[in-house]
Design a protein with these regions (language model features):
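Extended, charge-enriched "interface" segments that sit outside catalytic cores
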Residues: 1-82, 86
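C-terminal helix-coil-helix/basic helical segment that borders enzyme active sites and/or dimer interfaces
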Residues: 344-395, 491-505, 528
Length: 570
């Protein structure tokens, strides 16, 4: 029987990373749950890893044997609107029932609330697996991660009230964007007023492009401070569907991810609770929410990268032209090898980022219970910085790779790829949104570029160059060193130009170079530890990086302020 976890040993490989031992010890707080007699809590590192394998195996089984077989029906039917309520596609309802029965909700939450206490690494693996089966359903399922923000910033009373419901399988949404506030969230105008009589907040206004907008529990960004127009007037609220006051006005008809309802909502005096402190909704809470969501989109992207590669590979093996299978043609195996290299490198970046997030978040959680040692504080600061730096490249690069792999899968299918009966067209339609929502790739560049210019990425790269690799990888590593020198020169050229427009115009090329060098080093490390899985991809990806970094460095270092005139739109 198919299983989307056990069928792909490349996923399981990332459970064996050297950082996992420290990560699990912090996540389990030295296994205190087991010491306190909590059921199913691991007693040591090996027990924890075995728990993760079981959870991933269950996820892989449900993905392969329930969600994927339902995906075509969901894509064709989609959700619909009845009496201002969103109704899921019938097979989406079945997916929800089966994932609930399997216990796949509230998985990141502490066991005292009914959760499984899995780290981000494992949650990201689950997200990847479900996305490979159906990226639209992954949206609905993975929005449970909004509960992490409530856990982090909500009161103990709110935790006790809402977290067990998510662990039981209720759904969530994050209601941020509005008709006039898309990427520019400081323009949010949904109004929050305090009801003295009822001792609660009331929300009024419209939200647009809300994924899973008719969910059970919403986190809502709203303007709580009268007379303000910027981000400092915004707060975060919890809206419970049981209280009423929110209608679904419209469900968007989209290019892809048809099973995932994208809603326009009207808030009409809806009762809500303040989450955290006033005025910190955008500048603190939404930033945490968005970083988690961006990691989720990176995982969603890797799932589609994998499925697109699977579809292309299977078709190339069976399709014969000119007397032989098309997989024998250089033009085809060139595409397939690049697809696999992007997949393996992108997955490595995803899980390295998730590990950094886990290490930082676990130390932060421990700091709520006790004072951290000076060494732990330094460790938390280090991993916080790395998580912040790696998240935008993990999201941006993987979302682009998903579209590229889906595009190439269609190319391998030829005319059949353009026919609706083949899955590759759906993967292509689904993938297109990944580089748009939760911040376009251009916004990921904006988030990352300061780490390019302040030398953070360069130091990470130089540190990675010091790590030992296998004899087979040493020639590749030697080829990366001159690329790093070229990259450093390109960065310095842009900094020395001292022109903001030139800096912004060239930022994307510097971002791409950064990510490609980092992923080259990551995939070499993977190939050192598991050559049977990654050696081919390492060779292909380093060659791709050489080609791209050299071309982009040349472009950057031959660009001047005068060149901008040719590109400016009138």
């Amino acid at each position: 029987m198919a299983n989307y976890y056990t069928d792909h040993p490349e996923i399981a490989f990332h459970l064996e990373h050297p950082l996992m031992k420290r990560l699990v010890e912090l996540r389990e707080k030295n296994y205190e749950d087991a010491a306190n007699g909590i059921d199913y809590a691991p007693v040591d590192y090996e027990d924890a890893i075995e728990n993760y394998r079981r959870i991933l195996g269950i996820t892989g089984d449900v993905a392969a044997n329930v969600i994927e077989p339902n995906s075509e029906s969901v894509d064709l039917e989609g959700p619909h609107l009845e009496n201002n309520r969103m109704i899921y596609a019938s097979k989406t309802v079945e997916n929800l029932e089966q994932t609930r029965k399997a216990g796949l909700y509230g998985v990141s939450m502490p066991r005292r609330f009914g959760g499984l206490n899995v780290p981000n690494v494992v949650f990201s693996m689950m997200s990847e697996i479900i996305s490979a089966a159906d990226a639209g359903f992954q949206n609905i399922w993975s929005l449970q991660s909004c509960i992490d923000t409530l856990y982090e910033f909500g009161s103990e009373e709110q935790r006790a009230k809402y977290i067990p419901r998510i662990c039981a399988g209720e759904t969530m949404s994050m209601d941020l964007t509005e008709p006039d506030a898309g990427s520019d969230l400081q323009r949010v105008m949904l109004k929050a007023t305090f009801d003295e009589k009822e001792n609660c907040w009331r929300l009024n206004g419209v939200k647009r492009f809300i994924t899973n907008g008719d969910s059970d529990i919403h986190l809502v960004l709203a303007r709580s401070e009268e007379g303000t127009k910027d981000g400092r007037g915004l707060s975060m609220f919890i809206y419970d569907k049981r209280n009423g006051g929110v209608d679904v006005r419209h469900i968007e008809h989209k290019l892809g991810i048809h099973g995932s309802p994208t809603c326009e909502l009207t808030y009409k005096n809806a009762k809500a609770e303040l989450c955290g402190d006033r005025k910190l909704g955008l500048i603190k809470y939404v930033m945490a929410l968005m970083n988690g969501a961006r990691l989720g989109i990176a995982a969603q992207s890797v799932g589609v990268e994998q499925e697109a590669y699977n579809e292309g590979l299977a078709y190339a093996r069976e399709r014969a032209q000119f007397g032989e299978k098309i997989i024998k043609f250089p033009a085809v195996y060139d595409m397939l090898s690049r697809m696999k290299a992007k997949l393996d490198a992108g997955r490595s970046l995803l899980y390295q980022t998730a590990r950094y997030v886990d290490l930082y978040k676990s130390l932060e959680d421990i700091s709520r219970d006790r004072k951290l040692t000076p060494e732990e504080r330094n460790e938390m600061k280090q991993y916080s910085r790395l998580a912040d730096a790696f998240t935008p490249i993990a999201k941006g690069m993987n979302s682009e790779y998903a579209s590229q792999n889906a595009y190439d899968a269609i190319s391998i299918h030829g005319g059949s790829g353009f026919i609706m009966e083949y899955k590759s067209q759906r993967l292509y339609r689904d993938a297109r949104i990944f580089s748009i929502y939760e911040g376009t790739t251009q916004l990921q560049v904006v988030a990352a570029i300061r780490y390019v210019t302040n030398g953070t990425y360069l130091q990470v790269i130089k540190d990675m160059l010091q790590s030992e690799v296998s004899d087979a990888m040493k020639p590749l590593k030697a080829r990366i060193a001159p690329l790093v020198d070229l990259y450093e020169k390109a960065v310095n050229y842009v900094k020395e130009a001292n022109n903001e427009d030139v800096h912004d115009f060239l930022a994307r090329r510097l971002y791409d170079m950064t990510a490609e060098i980092i992923m080259s080093l990551l995939i070499m490390d993977d190939a050192t530890r598991a050559p049977e899985l990654f050696e081919k991809s390492a060779n292909v990806y380093v060659r791709m990086t050489e080609e791209d970094v050299c071309a982009k460095a040349y472009y950057v270092m031959h660009f001047t302020e005068a060149d901008l005139a040719s590109f400016r739109a009138e």
